[in-house]
Amino acid sequence: METEVKVKKIDSSFLEEAKKRSGEDLSLCYQCLKCTAGCPTAPHMDIRPNNIIRMIQMGRKEEVLGSSAIWLCVSCETCGTRCPNKIDIGVLMDALREMSVEEGIPAKEKNIHLLHEAFIKSIERGGRVHEATMLIDYKLRSKDFMTDLIP
């Protein structure tokens, strides 16, 4: 009994673009999982931080740029401080968000990009996140005033 194995060539252009935009050498990642273990938002992500890097290495551009993970990253830098190879995933996630917007690839969660914009604006205004004004800004941007109030 013979088993046929098909080998598919990986398109490295996404890896190269991500490296160029983020300034991070993603080939150094050996999947130790320290970034994911320390990430406070990882339990809410559809793709964990270590898997984002692996998927970039494998050229899975549409899946990465369409994931909620790139939008849920709060850039707390926990991943970068834990990484033995000093890969700053927060900077990578910023670059991936930019690429997602430029390519017009929508996130899985409705209005998640609006939440991210409100988060960034809150930091720009006061140097840190002010939850109340961020929430108001998000509600005004999304025009979604009642869904979280209705049981």
Predicted regions and their residues:
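Ferredoxin-type iron-sulfur electron-transfer modules in oxidoreductases and energy-metabolism complexes
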Residues: E4-R21, H44-I70, I89-D137
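Cysteine-centered iron-sulfur cluster-binding motifs in ferredoxin-type domains/subunits
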Residues: D25-A42, S68-I87
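Intrinsic disorder at enzyme termini
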Residues: M134-P151
